[in-house]
Amino acid sequence: MNGSRAWRLAAWLLLCLSCSAAVARKDSCETCTKLVERFHKGLENTAKKNFGGGNTAWEEKTLSKYESSEIRLVEIIENICDSSDFECNHMVEEHEEQIEKWWFKMKQKYPDLLKWFCIEAIKVCCPSGSYGPDCLACLGGSERPCHGNGFCSGDGTRSGDGSCRCKAEYTGSFCLECSDGYYSSERNDTHAVCIACNQACKTCNGPSNEDCKECNNGWVKDDGKCVDLNECASEESPCKDSQYCLNTEGSFLCKECDGSCSGCSGEGPESCKDCATGFVMLSGKCTDVDECDASEKLCLRENEVCLNTAGSYKCTCSEGFEDKEGNCVKIMETENPEITEGETGTPASDTNILNTAHEDL
């Protein structure tokens, strides 16, 4: 392996190790934070489990012994992690002595378990507004990371680089500049408020369409302000022949013509340019032609009638007839008389003989 290739491989391995360590530090802080939350939940559960019986004097006397007892700590720790949560169980096992130390010796002086355990004792988290192995202040300061307009990378963890991920309205390293589509209503060295431009503006320096620096798509400059461009007014429609154009603010919609139309300028049969097959123009709108009223008979089979439909017609068998092999034939009722209860199908003469024989016995 030549020297250049070996150097690149070493640099790649170093980068991978660095990334893995950063992820591990972030995950460790998340695990510790969750562990502390579960610990506080355990405090609530053990308090409810052992008290609240109504004997206040007895509870106060007993509580003073139980609330900081080893028994209570064991009950909490036994239920602090799910059995499948490897990271949580590993952290408890690795740092159980620290938890016991806080419980028996440090709790009164340092009541904030997250701060004492996660930040100061095992050093997997940072105070809010700081980041990285040394808990450096985020850009903009730990009190208002990213000047309150974004999120600090690694905030509260031992990972990240402290850079700002700005909210949609803001941009820049410190989240003090306004993004396209927003203008600055307040601004100083440490504070900025960005408000959305008028919908007509792509960029602006104020709230109205007269304050646009550049118009958004679908708007054009007219007399110093951005106004809606009516795409539907162009000579060539942006829609298909079977659709009409409907202008909207900054855009347009293509909507299907009425079924009676062959091309249209708007909604309904009165907006047809031409009528579709099966329709004729009457009183300014396309109306269905009733082909069944024509003098020439359209349905020629015996026992067949004509039914008008929108824009057409269909031939169907008359009531009481059905189509069989191209002919309308009468529907035959099936003869299937029901056998009444008690009937056996035995001939009457035989039945009488049987009855007679039975009577003779």
Swiss-Prot record:
SUPFAM superfamilies listed in its UniProt record: Growth factor receptor domain
Placement of FU repeats on the sequence: 191-238, 251-298
Polar residues bias locations: 346-355
PROSITE patterns assigned: ASX_HYDROXYL, EGF_1, EGF_2, EGF_3, EGF_CA
Sorted UniProt keywords: Calcium, Disulfide bond, EGF-like domain, Endoplasmic reticulum, Glycoprotein, Repeat, Secreted, Signal
Positions bearing carbohydrate: 188
Classification via PANTHER family: EGF-LIKE DOMAIN-CONTAINING PROTEIN, FIBRILLIN-RELATED
Function: Possible role in neuronal acetylcholine receptor transport.
Family from the record: Belongs to the CRELD family.
Entry protein name: Cysteine-rich with EGF-like domain protein 2-B
Species this chain originates from: Xenopus laevis
Protein encoded by which gene: creld2-b
